[in-house]
């Protein structure tokens, strides 16, 4: 049984090149397509998994491979001044200007908020416009392209310590903030990796940096140019599928916002485009739709994620 099957996703067709494996991350091949889709659309991504599962490593490698200015913030420790620098009044005292520090966000092209589920609520509110609007203090961040975050699974209200690791300091995000992440990706743990993936992980030998840089940039560009073609191809089918899926989730007490309905449509088109780039014509639309529901529901980031059975049942009925 593959890692993808254990996590509820259909196994991907064989690809000539795996993004995550080239970056030195094993066992994430089933996440290649949503990662590529997010990079091509510059959509925010939330990675959810236990400590030590390569969440931070992957993001740092992506930033390096794409040659982007990456700002890595530990959201559990951050202060607002760490983002914006030092505020000083301008002459006359009517306006503030920000004196940048080496870690401030102003020239960032890729922002990563680690441990976002341990962040104080007031700072989560300040991260909200960065993630959703690419703004801070009301000012547009012109260079910013990618906004990613990572967290440990939130601790359920009632838990059994014998069931595994519980992260008592990790709390569910505010629903409005969670709803701003088009892709919410659970990452595999050690026991979900196949033996060969485990062996490769122990050695961890990523591809040559220059090879990855050229290949990844090319894949992102081709995926971005393929998305409009997919949108045109799915124009008549997609609205009915998304409306049916959202209604079925509502019946299952998994309520989705109108914004999320639009996000699901956009995510499906970009994810199918990514799978066409990675796997060619073998990438079936049926599987792309299934993956969209598995990897683009905000409830995946809550204390009690929806069951695989529920999500796949909605997909089949829609």
Predicted regions and their residues:
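C-terminal regulatory/interaction module of P-loop NTP-utilizing enzymes
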Residues: 1-69, 81-111, 116-132, 136-318
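Switch/coupling segment of Walker-type NTPase motor domains
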Residues: 77
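Residue-level recognition of beta-strand->loop/alpha-helix junctions
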Residues: 72-74
